[in-house]
A protein has these predicted regions:
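Short glycine/serine- and small hydrophobic-enriched flexible loop segments
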Residues: 62-69
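NAD(P)-dependent Rossmann-like dehydrogenase/reductase catalytic/cofactor-binding core
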Residues: 1-2, 8-12, 22-47, 69-70, ...
């Protein structure tokens, strides 16, 4: 049984359990019991690239980056629209900064390679930012500027 957690871990109640071809039902039930005891709500997913949440979130972040690059709106407006429009805890660009732009890029590149699907082709601006060392909160600069420590 594989599993995936989400950033930031605290406050996230869901955990994804990846089921492979040889995964036994008993193993899944034991994993579910274990994670429920930790206060998590397990969801089952076929063992596929990205499972559920990372696969979908990466597309949302990538489209937000493309929208920014195309001048559809500024970063703050994109984030406010998503926070208020669909009740996200954070906008996709701020979330990307928290995760790390290098991590987001790696997920997108991995999904594109694994699936062969161009939906996961990373936005050009995302690649440029990572090459420039703008990795988000960890580097002090991403879609937003942060206090460097």
């Amino acid at each position: 049984v594989g599993f995936a957690t989400f950033y930031p871990l605290e406050g996230k109640k869901v955990i994804e359990l990846g089921t492979g071809l040889r995964t036994q039902e008993q193993a899944l039930q034991e994993a579910e019991t274990f994670f429920r005891a930790l206060g998590k709500e397990p969801v089952r997913a076929k063992d596929a690239p990205g499972l559920i949440f990372p696969r979908i979130l990466s597309l949302i972040i990538n489209e937000a980056v493309r929208s920014l690059d195309e001048g559809v709106a500024q970063a703050e407006e994109i984030d406010v629209a998503m926070r208020l429009g669909v009740n996200y805890p954070s906008g996709p660009l701020r979330w990307a900064d928290q995760i790390g732009l290098d991590e987001v890029l790696a997920v997108l590149e991995g999904l594109q390679q694994e699936t062969g699907d161009d939906r996961y082709r990373p936005a050009a601006l995302l690649k440029k930012m990572v090459l420039a060392g703008w990795l988000g909160e960890s580097s002090g600069r991403g879609f937003y500027k942060y206090n460097e420590t």
